[in-house]
Amino acid sequence: NNLLSDLPSLAIATDRVDREWIERPHRWRVRDIRNFMIVFGLVSSVFDLLTFALLYWLTAGDVEAFRTGWFIESLLTEVGVLLVIRTRLRAWQSRPAPMLLVATILVAIGSMLLPWTAVGSWFGLVPVTATVLLAVVLVLFGYLLASELTKGPFYRWLARGSTAARP
């Protein structure tokens, strides 16, 4: 999982920076980074718990299917949220660099196909039902939407209490 999610993470180095962040210098503060981690970590944790509950219910005690569903969901959310949190703008208003977008798409597709391959079976992954895949994709979209909707209020809150959010 970590190796695959590292590919889009490495590609972030090729990413575009929003024009607003190039025009004027900005200051980073550890407190602001900590607050970001707390807020978005809580959003992530809520969806992790939802995923665990759904997978527990949908896989009915099939440990391998649960593990595979978790593998797919955790990888999809990890690479998907990168496209959301890489910018303060709405994700669709800030185009990612081609390398970042391609790496993210390839890893997402690969994560969903891997359980049906010999390589996937080496890692204990098993094919899962369409219902499990649908649930994973719905959780993914819910998580990305929640993260996107959290950004605006978070950055407004940060701007009120910190000069780090202002140019």
Predicted regions and their residues:
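C-terminal transmembrane helices and immediately adjacent loops/tails
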Residues: 1-167
